[in-house]
Amino acid sequence: MSRDPILSLPWPDARPLPDTFFDRDALLVARELLGKVIRHRQGNLWLAARIIETEAYYLEEKGSHASLGYTEKRKALFLDGGHIYMYYARGGDSLNFSAGGPGNAVLIKSGHPWLDRISDHTALERMQSLNPDSQGRPREIGRLCAGQTLLCKAMGLKVPEWDAQRFDPQRLFVDDVGERPSQVIQAARLGIPKGRDEHLPYRFVDATFAAFCTRNPLRRGQVAGRDYHLLGHQDPHLQ
């Protein structure tokens, strides 16, 4: 059942994305998620991260989990847009949202801690305690959510709790805080095995935060037009 319109807000000016936002083409959803903020409630704290890197996946291409077929574990991919799909990657939790069309989804690849009156420095300290560095020290802010498993660890998001669930505005949702990237980088996805559509340009990065994503697409040796494309706010993305 659709939950539009959202009737139960956690605070008066919260703007949870409705299911209709997600129930669209995965590339469009992936790009437009940049700048949105994931909020997860832990006790009386709202942990928050701005989405800075996403990847789109489709049923009919070989890089997706859905291309391997329907299973109970993958059922969220085949539900309507706005369901949460979580799985384990390299031993850590990963967060995805189902998009329009069975089997299509968006992976939340990286985030950056978000601070405001709702999610303050106390919430940030909780995130750092959840995701310390290898020496047990607070991880620097720019690296705290710089990868799909680091993001989930810092946000306290776990597969058993959230896989195949819908958003809950009182516990976990994506907030539209009015931020829009001035430039977006489009490039090939990361970690796709050779021969499984690794060339498809289905990765999006907020250019302002390129240095804080999984792997900087603007690093030395990368060439515009060959390794990535830089899109302005009004520029159409590559299909």
UniProtKB/Swiss-Prot annotation:
Keyword flag Mitochondrion: no
Task: Specify whether NADP is a keyword of the entry.
Answer: no
Catalytic activity, EC = 3.2.2.-
Q: What class of enzyme is it?
A: hydrolase
Q: Which Pfam families match?
A: Pur_DNA_glyco
The cross-references to InterPro entries, in alphabetical order and at most eight, read: Formyl_transferase-like_C_sf (IPR011034), MPG (IPR003180), MPG_sf (IPR036995)
The record's listing under CDD domains reads: AAG
- Mind listing the UniProt keywords for this protein, alphabetically? DNA damage, DNA repair, Hydrolase
Q: Which GO terms describe its biological process?
A: base-excision repair
Q: What GO molecular function terms would the record report?
A: alkylbase DNA N-glycosylase activity; DNA binding
Q: What is the similarity comment for this entry?
A: Belongs to the DNA glycosylase MPG family.
Q: What HAMAP family would the database entry show?
A: 3MGH (MF_00527)
PANTHER family in the record: DNA-3-METHYLADENINE GLYCOSYLASE
This chain belongs to which protein, by name?
Putative 3-methyladenine DNA glycosylase
Organism for this UniProt entry: Pseudomonas aeruginosa (strain LESB58)
